[in-house]
């Protein structure tokens, strides 16, 4: 850096060339679909999105049938709503492992990643919303000498 800074206010105006910065390109297959995998807890979702009418299919079933709770359906739609693309893409996904909540989180993560593959300019919006970050929280293991991960057996003084 040949430019010298006189104050911290000038730091924002300083431009650094980054030729090694990753270029986010459109990644679609021959059927004009973007594919991504999403993960949450023990669930893994394989997601394909393509331009369409906003239809969501999970494990060959409608989303209303597979995810009966409205909260889970809302969770799946969040990345599309945040990117202002609700009703513009058809989503087809297969999801396995974990429970319904983990599966909904995995589908949401997969939809977010697939959207960035289809439209790389949406990456900033989705990243700011936290949709591209893998939620790394998993169940804590049970320890020996304990009833559960942290719960101790009942203690008796006498």
From Swiss-Prot:
Keywords: Ribonucleoprotein, Ribosomal protein. One of its GO terms (cellular component) is cytosolic small ribosomal subunit. The keyword Ribonucleoprotein applies. It holds the Pfam family Ribosomal_S9. One of its GO terms (molecular function) is RNA binding. One of its GO terms (biological process) is translation. The keyword Ribonucleoprotein applies. SUPFAM superfamilies: Ribosomal protein S5 domain 2-like. Belongs to the universal ribosomal protein uS9 family. This is Small ribosomal subunit protein uS9. It comes from Rhodopseudomonas palustris (strain BisA53).
